[in-house]
């Protein structure tokens, strides 16, 4: 059994994206996989059990057999936090070691850390505490957001030494890709850090379901409720002159247009282009002809009481931060990893 920790020093770097993409490719090659998420922050009620939503969907997509509770070591809650502060034992480390033992028949077990190398320290289950204990190797997953992300990778080298397999750099914007390849990667390689993959930001993987948007802005759906499982890839604010709106909207596919309820001119133009939904801010109700046209075009209209700025701010918090649980997103992850990840090199050194 090869235990592989996927760790990062900041949230939403895409650790489970790599587990899914790499995992689906390895399954295709005949490998038996295991999966454990160290700390769950997405409580999800399934029948009478509280489990971690992300861990559940990853295990389902990878078709890993076992009870739902076998895929997440510890789920954070207010009660758990209080017990930690009262120095009460929660047996998190014991539970983790039991989960590892349950998956000892696997070829590779992916263990996903939290939002930093030290998260879980108070429970005894941070990556820093566990890597040596179970003789694991480490893969660092970092997003490219600024040059200081290099420090996180160098820190992992310092902390985990020969246990570090290398790193992957995720969510690189198109205009910085060549810079990362030609400057960042050589710098890290000189310091004996393998780079297995550089992945560009992907519109499909960053896309958000309309139902999640509604939830985040406390919205009310006016029409076309059957379309709320559709995905939005782009967001545009419709605050311009109508004469400019069409050329602005037509360049951006699969979008949500955010505008005021009084801007029926913008709403009509948005519906003539590739628009997934229209979000009306300020709590105003759209005019009846607009609702009729939206029904004809099968475009949901959502109303929120938030102003435009607050609406955009809330939606931005969702982008790239939702759980991958849809088959088409998992398949996209598989395709990207197949093309961009040095799978053979990875398998040789684990």
Labelled PLM ranges:
Residues 1-5:
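Extreme N-terminal starter segment of soluble prokaryotic enzymes
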Residues 8-10, 38-39, 71, 112-115, ...:
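Fold-independent oxyanion-binding glycine-rich loops
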Residues 73-78, 82, 87-90, 186-206:
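Ligand-binding beta-strand-loop-alpha-helix segment within the catalytic cores
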Residues 81-123, 128-132:
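Phosphate-binding/switch loop-helix module in NTP-utilizing enzymes
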């Amino acid at each position: 059994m090869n235990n592989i920790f996927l760790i990062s020093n900041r949230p939403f770097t895409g650790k489970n994206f790599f587990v899914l993409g790499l995992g689906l490719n390895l399954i295709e090659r005949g490998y038996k996989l295991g999966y454990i998420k160290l700390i769950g922050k997405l409580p999800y009620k399934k029948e009478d059990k509280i489990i971690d939503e992300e861990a559940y969907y990853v295990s389902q997509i990878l078709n890993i057999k076992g009870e739902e509770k076998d895929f997440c070591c510890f789920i954070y809650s207010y009660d758990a936090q209080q017990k930690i502060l009262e120095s009460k034992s929660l047996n998190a480390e014991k539970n983790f070691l039991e989960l590892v033992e349950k998956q000892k028949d696997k070829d590779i077990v992916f263990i996903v850390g939290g939002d930093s190398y030290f998260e879980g320290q108070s429970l005894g289950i941070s990556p820093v505490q566990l890597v040596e204990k179970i003789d694991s190797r480490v893969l660092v997953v970092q997003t490219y957001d600024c040059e200081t992300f290099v420090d996180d990778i160098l820190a992992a080298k310092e902390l985990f030494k020969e246990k570090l397999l290398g790193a992957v750099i995720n969510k690189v914007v198109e205009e910085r890709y060549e810079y990362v390849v030609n400057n960042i990667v050589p710098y890290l390689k000189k310091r004996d850090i393998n780079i297995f993959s550089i992945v560009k930001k992907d519109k499909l993987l960053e896309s958000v379901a309309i139902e999640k948007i509604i939830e985040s802005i406390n919205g009310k759906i006016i029409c076309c409720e059957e379309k709320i499982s559709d995905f939005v890839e782009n967001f545009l604010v419709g605050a311009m002159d109508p004469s400019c709106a069409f050329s602005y909207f037509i360049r951006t596919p699969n979008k949500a247009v955010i505008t005021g309820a009084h801007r029926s001119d913008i709403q009509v133009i948005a519906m003539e282009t590739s628009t997934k939904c229209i979000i009306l801010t300020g709590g105003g109700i759209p005019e009846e002809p607009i609702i009729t046209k939206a029904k004809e075009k099968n475009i949901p209209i959502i109303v929120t009481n938030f102003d435009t700025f607050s609406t955009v701010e809330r939606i931005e918090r969702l982008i790239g931060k939702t759980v991958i649980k849809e088959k088409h997103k998992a398949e996209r992850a598989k395709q990207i990893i197949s093309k961009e990840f040095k799978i053979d090199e990875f398998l040789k050194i684990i």
